Regions:
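Conserved nucleotide-sugar donor-binding
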Residues: 1-11
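A conserved hydrophobic position in a structured secondary element of the catalytic/binding core
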Residues: 2, 21, 39
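Acidic donor-binding loop at a coil-to-helix junction in glycosyltransferase catalytic cores
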Residues: 18-25
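Hydrophobic residues within well-ordered alpha-helices
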Residues: 29-30
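Active-site-adjacent helix/loop segment of glycosyltransferases
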Residues: 36, 45-113
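Juxtamembrane C-terminal module of membrane proteins
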Residues: 85, 115-143
């Protein structure tokens, strides 16, 4: 939830963002001295059941977003946090005796990471490849 008065004062979400408009807005709030609260008791239902290729495309857009907004994401350790999550998930699956799920976690994570890295380097890619990699082709129409 956002305070409407501050949202309007700050100009709302960035006008052009492929992904992460909420994080970009939150980062700009923090830079202006406002706070962001974590509500541990908040109930949110948000789920995706993406295939490996869909994960690649989604994380490509995530990488593009981070590359386009270094003022927000420069100090964010996305890769390190992702690796920690993968390791934690694999340990959990071992403890629960569900080791047959581990190859899927590794494959999904590899697709996410490959997409993310490609997105971070999108400026070096040919347009045709960018259009293949993105989940949001509309974003690239006017570029």
């Amino acid at each position: 939830a956002y305070r409407r008065d501050i949202y309007l004062e700050m100009g709302g979400f960035v006008k052009r963002a492929i992904f992460n408009e909420d994080m970009i807005y939150a980062g700009s709030l923090i830079q202006e001295g406002y706070g962001i609260a974590y509500a541990a008791d908040a109930k949110v239902i948000h789920s995706h059941n993406y295939s490996c290729m869909q994960q690649f495309h989604r994380n490509f857009d995530l990488g593009v977003s981070q590359a386009e907004h270094p003022e927000i994401f420069e100090g964010v350790p996305s890769e390190g946090e992702g690796i920690k999550l993968v390791k934690k998930t694999i340990r959990y699956l071992f403890r629960k005796g569900k080791i047959w799920l581990i190859p899927g976690v590794i494959l999904q994570s590899g697709c996410k990471y490959a997409g993310y890295l490609a997105g971070k380097k999108y400026r070096k890619l040919p347009r045709k490849m960018i259009l293949w990699c993105t989940m949001n082709r509309e974003y690239w129409k006017d570029l």
